Amino acid sequence: MDENNHGVSSSSLPPFLTKTYEMVDDSSSDSIVSWSQSNKSFIVWNPPEFSRDLLPRFFKHNNFSSFIRQLNTYGFRKADPEQWEFANDDFVRGQPHLMKNIHRRKPVHSHSLPNLQAQLNPLTDSERVRMNNQIERLTKEKEGLLEELHKQDEEREVFEMQVKELKERLQHMEKRQKTMVSFVSQVLEKPGLALNLSPCVPETNERKRRFPRIEFFPDEPMLEENKTCVVVREEGSTSPSSHTREHQVEQLESSIAIWENLVSDSCESMLQSRSMMTLDVDESSTFPESPPLSCIQLSVDSRLKSPPSPRIIDMNCEPDGSKEQNTVAAPPPPPVAGANDGFWQQFFSENPGSTEQREVQLERKDDKDKAGVRTEKCWWNSRNVNAITEQLGHLTSSERS
């Protein structure tokens, strides 16, 4: 459609110029469009009728603005600003052959400006290399940004999954909490159930009493060592029954303390009497003195090794013959005046300490059975004490007779 050759014939004119010339030169439409008085321009007198009647007939559209843009493309200009008058130096009445000099202008777009500038100002080699490096750098930055964007999208998806999971767990916890609250409310509604919800203080809520482990009778049952009795007092209770129980516990504790003092005093007096009697016996005998035992060892060892019948002691039993061979024969004691000379002679000659002390010395060699050693010693001391008591009873009865 464009004509760039100046030597073309009139038959090769653009259709827009040919149709425009015919439309303006038609005398039947002079009331709408016509030539000016100078015959070098044309005037559109009635644009609405021009758009409604003439444009559809010649150009197959009714847009007056589009017609004006096409005139500007072919070099037409507005001759009078107060009316629609357009002119071109080669568009003259009666001279259609001049229109061959009218050429359509190429539209200038924004993206074509760099190409024009490049044609006008060619780049040097250094500038071209610099531009290429910049293009490569920008391309790499674009790729890095795209990768980072992809990672951000993946992290966002992971976060969304975690948030969804946390919401589900929260809903589950709320459901469990509601279930527990409903269960507790149902339990509290039951008759005969009372719960003390007052805060408890650990220091005053429970008190431990450690009872002594001293036992003075070998026939009592064995108890665990260091056994403690815990007396729990409820701070929040204010009923009379709780005060009564506390009072009874205090009375029991005071009575236990009294009995403990009484037993300890009796134990000390018995040990003192036994030590005095042992000294009298040891002065007249040639056997080595056995180490004294405390009251605690006596009670504990007597329970660890209790004989089948601790209350029955055979004072007339004869010592083992094999052990008597190893012992040194003691000289006979001097005769004692009185009716019970035979008794004293038998008592001092049949002292069981010689055999029992040897057993104790043999058992001390075993380091793995220390409890057994204490049991044998305590058993001998308990037998010795019981024997002395019974012999004293025989002595008093014989003297009376």
UniProtKB/Swiss-Prot annotation:
User: Which InterPro entries would you find in this protein's record?
Assistant: HSF_DNA-bd, WH-like_DNA-bd_sf, WH_DNA-bd_sf
Composition bias, Basic and acidic residues = 356-373
Q: Where is this motif: Nuclear localization signal?
A: 207-213
What's an example GO cellular component term for this entry? nucleus
The record places the motif (AHA2) at 341-350
Q: Which residues form the signal peptide?
A: none
In alphabetical order, the GO MF annotations are: DNA-binding transcription factor activity; protein homodimerization activity; transcription cis-regulatory region binding
Q: Mind listing the UniProt keywords for this protein, alphabetically?
A: Activator, Cytoplasm, DNA-binding, Nucleus, Phosphoprotein, Repeat, Stress response, Transcription, Transcription regulation
Q: Which GO terms describe its biological process?
A: positive regulation of DNA-templated transcription; regulation of DNA-templated transcription; response to reactive oxygen species
What SUPFAM superfamilies would the database entry show?
Apolipoprotein A-I, Winged helix' DNA-binding domain
Give a short account of its post-translational modification. Exhibits temperature-dependent phosphorylation.
Q: Where is this motif: Nuclear export signal?
A: 388-395
According to the UniProt record, where is the region Disordered? 351-373
Compartments where located: Cytoplasm; Nucleus
Return the annotated region ranges for Hydrophobic repeat HR-A/B.
122-188
**What SMART domains would the database entry show?**
HSF
Q: Its domain of life?
A: Eukaryota
Motif extent (AHA1): 256-265
Q: Which residues bind DNA?
A: 13-107
Free-text comment on this protein's domains from its UniProt entry: The hydrophobic-rich region (HR-A/B) corresponds to the oligomerization domain. AHA motifs are transcriptional activator elements.
Family per UniProt?
Belongs to the HSF family. Class A subfamily.
Q: What binding partners and quaternary form does the record give?
A: Homotrimer.
Physiological role:
Transcriptional activator that specifically binds DNA sequence 5'-AGAAnnTTCT-3' known as heat shock promoter elements (HSE).
Q: What is the name of this protein?
A: Heat stress transcription factor A-4a
What species does this protein belong to?
Arabidopsis thaliana (Mouse-ear cress)
* Record lineage: Eukaryota, Viridiplantae, Streptophyta, Embryophyta, Tracheophyta
